[in-house]
Amino acid sequence: MSETDAGAPGAPEAAEGQAPGIRILAQFIRDLSFENPRAPDALRAAQTQPQIDLGVEMNARGREDGLFEVDLKLSARATRDDGALFVVELLYGGVFQIAGVPAEDLEPVLLIECPRYLFPFARRIIADVTAEGGFPPFMLDPIDFAGVYAARKAQEQEQVGHA
């Protein structure tokens, strides 16, 4: 689910000759959840690899001060035939200052480039939390945020076409 509010007061206007720029002013954990429902039994070595289901969501919104908040939500659920091993959900946020980006390009910058900056930090948090839960660190593979964005835009267009 993606949401942008490019019309926020103080939203950047593309200035003549101004080079586009992104500054990360803050990064933070907005919400973190780790469930280990079958500990300690689930920590024993097993013959089969767990099934991993991943989820990725990006949201962005303009603030009254002209900055933008971007949230990256990552979730992972590991299961085996006998049930869930762990569930981790992280909502990781950042405050960004965007300069020199035309209004029509702002949404892709907020939902592709900004999450790309946040991802390595969120990935590390998930790896650390799963390791502290007694499992090997769960290292998320890199995410193609441009592909996720394109798929969401295509889905939105399809929904508009059916309306």
Swiss-Prot record:
Subcellular location(s) per record: Cytoplasm
GO molecular function, one term: unfolded protein binding
Pfam families found in the cross-reference section: SecB
Name of this chain's protein: Protein-export protein SecB
Single GO BP term: protein tetramerization
Entry similarity comment: Belongs to the SecB family.
HAMAP family: SecB
Top-level taxonomic group: Bacteria
Keywords in alphabetical order: Chaperone, Cytoplasm, Protein transport, Translocation, Transport
Assembly information from the UniProt record: Homotetramer, a dimer of dimers. One homotetramer interacts with 1 SecA dimer.
Function as written in the Swiss-Prot or TrEMBL entry: One of the proteins required for the normal export of preproteins out of the cell cytoplasm. It is a molecular chaperone that binds to a subset of precursor proteins, maintaining them in a translocation-competent state. It also specifically binds to its receptor SecA.
InterPro entries listed in its UniProt record: SecB, SecB-like_sf
Name of the gene: secB
Gene3D superfamilies on file: SecB-like
Any GO CC annotation of this UniProt entry: cytoplasm
